[in-house]
């Protein structure tokens, strides 16, 4: 019986209700207080008028005598503690008691000089009179009125999140500074016209120390042309590499937009339970003729890994093939068996009875995420030991993600995007988001980090990838001009030049002198602009491969091979990891891959090169293969749509997006290797196809496809165009076409 009572009282919801009932009872006791009721100071035979009875009469008299009106702080504290218990926000009992005592003593001291008929002593009670008389011996009464309100403010600060206060003060200071500067910038030039406030030509108002962007970059203000023929005060900050307008000062989103981690940490299995499960596992292995011993147990938030050392002569493939039989024998959802790199053991992973869920905020607040050596942090989740796993996209340098519907793939991609949004401003990192499904990435449409609105048409997706290739080539030319090898060196050199107030110039040969034959050089000034990282996110690769497979594969290959040093990285996802979507060329250029739960062993081998993904549990459970080809199991964090909506709304309010129209606009030139997917025909390519048909006397789609090295859809469009122009006939009953052009 006591066990069940203890179990009920340990529930946070039950504790909250009990605290609320106690607080309400104290309020009723204090509100129904009557000085004529029986108490410690008076004796009467009449029944007490207090609503709680004789207990309420004595309790109210005690509280009013000692604490006065400040007794209402006690039920207020009960209500606040009950709310915290309800939401699982536990704090130290010492801190809670200290806060209440500090509030009672400070408030009682402030009210000690007020006399009331209801309370014989004072409005602050006996405690207030004692503390006030003691302090007046050493401190002036005026200072006393300043010290104890400070204690009350300290109480309020202890009960409120410091992050909320700091964010409010930052926003308030930004707002006031901005409008004060606008006021002086508008009023002072007009006062100088009438001689009230003369301004010299070289007067400048330096606000560097008053207003700076709360991120790693600096902001340069651009001034509008004034209509007043006077010398206005110039409002400036030392120019750096990126420029944004004065009403679009971008900042990182506050951490308070993310949901707080709930206190739902599941109590793990005890050591005795783990040993018992290990013995059961050994028994099952012995039943199948596998001998060995378990040397270590690693309990994680979702699964528990048993390190099994097989006997000498036991093949690994034999143990791995028993995964389904072990899961059936132990009544487990699934079992994954894999070799642990660097150890002479096999890791047998069994799911826990209760799964631990954790949110993204818990991982963003870790030291691993704050590590500045990680240039492009991607929050992946927690490993088998429960430690945060933060990957660096700059070192990957590209990521391939696969998983079926409901496996947590979309939530994982959202966590990666949000982790980048919390690290970089729009001047430091930009995105190209391609979402043919028009569902997953549409929530980010309109944020200032985008180079173009979310691309949903496959034809524009090819153009966007083509633009990324051109941007990569342009960046390589810029880096070679100043003699650096990567984007980090380029930005460092630009920042160094800006700090020294100099420009970077480079002589370029433009020709030769016709008289002397010596080379002619011209000095070219480099554009002093910092290059941001560009992350290309493709949510569904299968749809793009269906429309223009060859062209997409070629562009992805070029970016994956060369774009790392230029600061362009790709995150590509698909829910159909088949060989026609994830081709050998793509796999060779994406060493870093993530596989969520898939349907079959074949899909697991396609994405990772080995089986195991089909044994995952779903809901964020994944296998991560870094660029070292080492596979580790990771459990992803949860980020809901409400959090994403808050973050995107904040970013939209702080800054407007600056789109580059060329990202999705078809260039005027004709490129024979571009299939825009809408049935249009390139005239140059069409003439080549007609020439091939005339010379070779072959008109099949596959032959034209091989000859021109284009996609099947484009070759079919060319043949249909020839049929309309009367070059070839329509296909007969066997599918062959007759060539109507005469031989050359």
Curated annotation (Swiss-Prot):
Topology relative to the membrane: Multi-pass membrane protein
Any GO MF annotation of the entry: ATP hydrolysis activity
Pfam families: FtsK_4TM (PF13491), FtsK_alpha (PF17854), FtsK_gamma (PF09397), FtsK_SpoIIIE (PF01580)
The entry's keywords: ATP-binding, Cell cycle, Cell division, Cell inner membrane, Cell membrane, Chromosome partition, DNA-binding, Membrane, Nucleotide-binding, Transmembrane, Transmembrane helix
PROSITE patterns the UniProt entry points to: FTSK (PS50901)
Domain FtsK per the UniProt entry, residue ranges: 386-605
One of the record's GO cellular component terms: plasma membrane
Gene Ontology biological process terms from the UniProt entry: cell division; chromosome segregation
Residue intervals passing through the bilayer: 15-35, 62-82, 92-112, 114-134, 138-158, 179-199
Listed InterPro entries: AAA+_ATPase, FtsK/SpoIIIE/SftA, FtsK_4TM, FtsK_alpha, FtsK_dom, Ftsk_gamma, P-loop_NTPase, WH-like_DNA-bd_sf
Residues that bind ATP: 406-411
Residue spans, topological domain Cytoplasmic: 200-744
Record note on quaternary structure: Homohexamer. Forms a ring that surrounds DNA.
Description of its domains: Consists of an N-terminal domain, which is sufficient for the localization to the septal ring and is required for cell division, followed by a linker domain, and a C-terminal domain, which forms the translocation motor involved in chromosome segregation. The C-terminal domain can be further subdivided into alpha, beta and gamma subdomains. The alpha and beta subdomains multimerise to produce a hexameric ring, contain the nucleotide binding motif and form the DNA pump.
Cross-referenced PANTHER family: DNA TRANSLOCASE FTSK, SPORULATION PROTEIN RELATED
Family per record: Belongs to the FtsK/SpoIIIE/SftA family.
Protein task: Essential cell division protein that coordinates cell division and chromosome segregation. The N-terminus is involved in assembly of the cell-division machinery. The C-terminus functions as a DNA motor that moves dsDNA in an ATP-dependent manner towards the dif recombination site, which is located within the replication terminus region. Translocation stops specifically at Xer-dif sites, where FtsK interacts with the Xer recombinase, allowing activation of chromosome unlinking by recombination. FtsK orienting polar sequences (KOPS) guide the direction of DNA translocation.
Protein name, entry field: DNA translocase FtsK
Name of the gene this protein is made from: ftsK
